[in-house]
A protein has these predicted regions:
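Conserved HGGG/HGGXW glycine-rich cap/lid loop of the alpha/beta-hydrolase fold
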Residues: 6-64
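Conserved catalytic-core motifs of eukaryotic protein kinase domains, centered on the activation segment
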Residues: 37-39, 62-68, 128-130, 222-223
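Active-site loop/oxyanion-hole signature of alpha/beta-hydrolase fold enzymes
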Residues: 43, 52-93, 263
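Conserved loop-alpha-helix segment in the C-terminal half of the alpha/beta-hydrolase fold
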Residues: 43, 206-249
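Gly/Ala-rich beta-loop-alpha elbow adjacent to hydrolase catalytic centers
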Residues: 94, 98, 102
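Flexible "cap/lid" loop of the alpha/beta hydrolase fold
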Residues: 103-108, 112-144
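Conserved alpha/beta-hydrolase catalytic His-Asp/Glu region
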Residues: 127-131, 146-203
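Catalytic active-site module of serine/aspartate enzymes centered on a nucleophile-bearing elbow/loop
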Residues: 238-292
Length: 292
């Protein structure tokens, strides 16, 4: 199993798949699904891109140190992973909590970012969303794991999709993946999202950032109440940020419309690569890890 040890000694499990010389997409998974969030879009992306998928600190086969977790801390871990595997600049694709990490990463590490997509994410939760995450945190502490998984599924996946042939097994799928998690990490992930405030980072973002949001998402909608900072407002504040909405779904575009998600994000990355290659010093060597 491939592991990378980052600066503070934590070992991260990672997989690097796809065409050897393809542009690399660093994938940042969500707080409950982790790297499994991308399971239905990986094959589509691998037709053109190389994928760097990993278990974040506290998840899966990576180390699970006890202590505080934060969105900015997970972004720093991602930069450490790039150092460890010998990658200079990458495309970044994060979803849900991973989208929040993508925002933090793009702001903090512009020299490592060609372009980024923050899927179903925002920069700061409003009162409603903070209450949702606090509720999740309490559920993790008190509810049966399967009951918590079912509750989250009803918030993340649309009612019509649940009753469609594609969504027939969605509840069991979510149960199986959520069961892989360490409850300690999930609790701290909820706390990290509850307390997150990337407002000051948004104006500093200098690399192209695509926000993809479902119009009917109750967890991370494009528009938040005044105390929050959602995708639409982010795009108004910074000209390098753009928003694409999925008009018929909620939080789970990578599950409910994976082909559309792959196409929209892939085309955005292609345009960003074209622009970056036209503006040296970026070359294809920047995203090619050394032979091992």
């Amino acid at each position: 199993m491939p592991y990378a040890q980052i600066e503070d000694g934590v070992r991260l499990y990672y997989e690097l798949t796809g065409p050897d010389h393809g542009p690399v997409i660093l994938q940042l998974g969500g707080g409950l699904f982790g790297r499994h969030n991308f399971g239905l879009v990986n094959d589509g992306f691998r037709e053109r891109f190389r994928l760097l998928s990993f278990d974040a600190r506290g998840y899966g086969a990576s180390d699970h140190p006890r202590g505080a977790y934060s969105i900015e801390g997970w972004a720093a871990d991602a930069a450490g992973l790039l150092d460890a595997v010998g990658l200079d600049r990458v495309l970044v694709h994060g979803t849900s909590m991973g989208g929040m990490i993508a925002i933090a990463f793009t702001a903090a590490y512009p020299e490592r970012t060609i372009a980024a997509c923050a899927d179903v994410a925002f920069a700061k939760p409003d009162v409603y969303r903070r209450t949702v995450f606090r509720g999740w945190r309490r559920m993790v502490e008190t509810m049966a794991w399967d009951d918590f998984s079912d509750h989250v599924t009803t918030q993340a996946v649309g009612a019509r999709f649940m009753e469609s042939p594609e969504g027939e097994n969605i509840f069991q799928l979510v149960r199986d993946i959520v069961a892989l998690n360490d409850p300690y990490t999930v609790r701290h992930a909820c706390l990290a999202m509850e307390n997150m405030d990337l407002s000051s980072s948004v104006p500093r973002i200098s690399r192209p950032l695509l926000m993809t949001n479902g119009t009917h998402d109750i967890l991370c909608p494009p528009d938040l109440a005044p105390s929050g900072l959602g995708a639409r407002k982010m795009a108004e504040l910074n000209e390098v940020i753009e928003l694409v909405e999925f008009p018929d779904i909620g939080h789970a575009d990578l599950v409910e419309c994976p082909a559309d998600a792959t196409r929209i994000v892939g085309e955005f990355f292609e345009r960003a690569l074209e622009a970056a290659l036209a503006s040296p010093p970026l070359t294809s060597a920047d995203w090619s890890p050394p032979s091992r």
